[in-house]
Regions:
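Short hydrophobic/aromatic patches on the structural cores and recognition surfaces of FHA
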Residues: 90, 106, 121
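Short acidic-glycine-tyrosine-enriched beta hairpin
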Residues: 98-114
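Ligand-binding loop in jelly-roll beta-barrel domains
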Residues: 113-140
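A short, N-terminal "cap"/entry segment at the start of jelly-roll beta-barrel domains
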Residues: 1-58, 145-180
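Conserved short histidine dyad/triad with adjacent acidic residue
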Residues: 44-49, 62-78, 116
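Asparagine-centered polar/low-complexity signal
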Residues: 28-30, 62, 123
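Short, conserved beta-strand element in jelly-roll/cupin
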Residues: 63-67, 78-96, 134-138
Length: 180
């Protein structure tokens, strides 16, 4: 997915110093450009991600809208990053730790890192489901996907991808493989 920045807040009638602070610190997700992601048959979302020009370096945010019957990502858990979801509109289902939990507008969902909390959000309703996805940005990061037996390792330095590797868990090598 391409990185899309949130537009800075509109700042009429502010002093130059206040205007500069607002431009640096405030973003409005209602004016953000959306990227449409589709991977049939299960995955589809409209998403705006706050990335390159965000003032905070240890937090990430996206606004996700998932159509009825779809989900935005596979069932997974993080080794380092924490996530929080704030349901803005609609209803759906949080699949977490093998359980299905109903979610509604106004719910705030906290997901710690670790294998105890594999998760994803499904839109099981007949209307769009819109939520904020907030995460810590801990690098490097490893995600595991229990349903598909995959592992993804990735890292960023100054918002540039320096490592991204996805492979099947059972396709590993011996530590000493190909070493002299």
């Amino acid at each position: 997915m391409e990185d899309i920045s949130f537009a800075p807040a509109v700042t009429p009638d502010l002093t130059p110093a206040a205007s500069a602070l607002a431009a640096r610190l405030i973003r409005n997700f209602n004016s953000a450009a959306l990227e449409h992601f589709v991977r049939p048959p299960l995955y589809e979302s409209l998403s705006a991600q706050l990335r390159p020009d965000r003032p905070g370096r240890k937090l990430g945010l996206s606004v996700d809208t998932v159509p009825p019957g779809k989900q935005s990502c596979p069932y997974h858990f993080h080794h380092a990053q924490e996530e929080m979801f704030v349901v803005l509109e609609g209803t759906g289902t949080l699949r977490v730790a093998g359980e299905l939990l109903p979610i509604v507008a106004g719910d705030v969902i906290f997901v710690p890192p670790g294998p105890e909390y594999p998760h994803h959000i499904l839109n099981t309703s007949s209307a769009p489901l819109k939520y904020l996805s907030i995460s810590t940005k801990e690098w490097p990061e490893v995600c595991e996907y229990p349903d598909s037996g995959k592992l993804m390792a990735f890292s960023f330095v100054q918002d540039e991808t320096t490592l991204r590797s996805v492979h099947k868990m059972d396709a590993g090598l011996d530590y000493w493989d190909s070493e002299a």
